[in-house]
Amino acid sequence: MKSSNGPLRIGIGGPVGSGKTTLCEVLLKSMRDRYSMAVVTNDIYTKEDALILARLQAISEDRIVGVETGGCPHTAIREDASLNLAAIAHLNRRFPDLDIILIESGGDNLAATFSPDLADLTLYVISVAQGEKIPRKGGPAITRSDLLIINKTDLAPYVGANLDVMRSDTEKVREGRPYVMTDLSRRQGAEEVVAFIEKMGGLALAA
């Protein structure tokens, strides 16, 4: 299923430890039998996330490209996306039938956003472990990403976070934009994320 516009490019951002790599693993394992997929991971000085996905057998290693960004991680997904664009071009040449490319950013702050030249859809992951105040802090990634994923809901009792407060704050700052509460380590909420990608990425129409 090859789109005339090329593969759907999905940017996945979020702070360190929020669950970006776990989200990539879940999406790859959930969708790889229906779609031709690949992933680009960004780390500052290593290719750790790429190695993790390979070790988890989320997808064949030749479909994983690790990018070492150096410096500030959000520069490589917005101001100067050349390293990521080169990785995408490499994957497109190697796998001409690609339907989806995931682009996982390095750990970043709440202001980081993807260049529209790099990502067609943006998913932003935050963790309940960061505290219930995170949604109301706002920031472009929280307020304007195509889908906000509030992950690690299972940790709420241990960090004193009220999930109802987080939902209410999220609905206020996102002004109708979609969000989902997840516990990706247990795959809870994963189906909602997949359904969002298929609908908003036009995959269901193209199938």
From Swiss-Prot:
<keyword id="KW-0963">Cytoplasm</keyword>
<comment type="function">
    <text>Facilitates the functional incorporation of the urease nickel metallocenter. This process requires GTP hydrolysis, probably effectuated by UreG.</text>
</comment>
<protein>
    <recommendedName>
        <fullName>Urease accessory protein UreG</fullName>
    </recommendedName>
</protein>
<dbReference type="InterPro" id="IPR004400">
    <property type="entry name" value="UreG"/>
</dbReference>
<dbReference type="GO" id="GO:0005525">
    <property type="term" value="F:GTP binding"/>
</dbReference>
<dbReference type="GO" id="GO:0016151">
    <property type="term" value="F:nickel cation binding"/>
</dbReference>
<dbReference type="InterPro" id="IPR003495">
    <property type="entry name" value="CobW/HypB/UreG_nucleotide-bd"/>
</dbReference>
<keyword id="KW-0143">Chaperone</keyword>
<dbReference type="GO" id="GO:0005737">
    <property type="term" value="C:cytoplasm"/>
</dbReference>
<comment type="subunit">
    <text>Homodimer. UreD, UreF and UreG form a complex that acts as a GTP-hydrolysis-dependent molecular chaperone, activating the urease apoprotein by helping to assemble the nickel containing metallocenter of UreC. The UreE protein probably delivers the nickel.</text>
</comment>
<feature type="binding site">
    <location>
        <begin position="14"/>
        <end position="21"/>
    </location>
    <ligand>
        <name>GTP</name>
    </ligand>
</feature>
<keyword id="KW-0547">Nucleotide-binding</keyword>
<comment type="similarity">
    <text>Belongs to the SIMIBI class G3E GTPase family. UreG subfamily.</text>
</comment>
<dbReference type="Pfam" id="PF02492">
    <property type="entry name" value="cobW"/>
</dbReference>
<keyword id="KW-0342">GTP-binding</keyword>
<dbReference type="GO" id="GO:0043419">
    <property type="term" value="P:urea catabolic process"/>
</dbReference>
<keyword id="KW-0996">Nickel insertion</keyword>
<dbReference type="GO" id="GO:0003924">
    <property type="term" value="F:GTPase activity"/>
</dbReference>
<dbReference type="InterPro" id="IPR027417">
    <property type="entry name" value="P-loop_NTPase"/>
</dbReference>
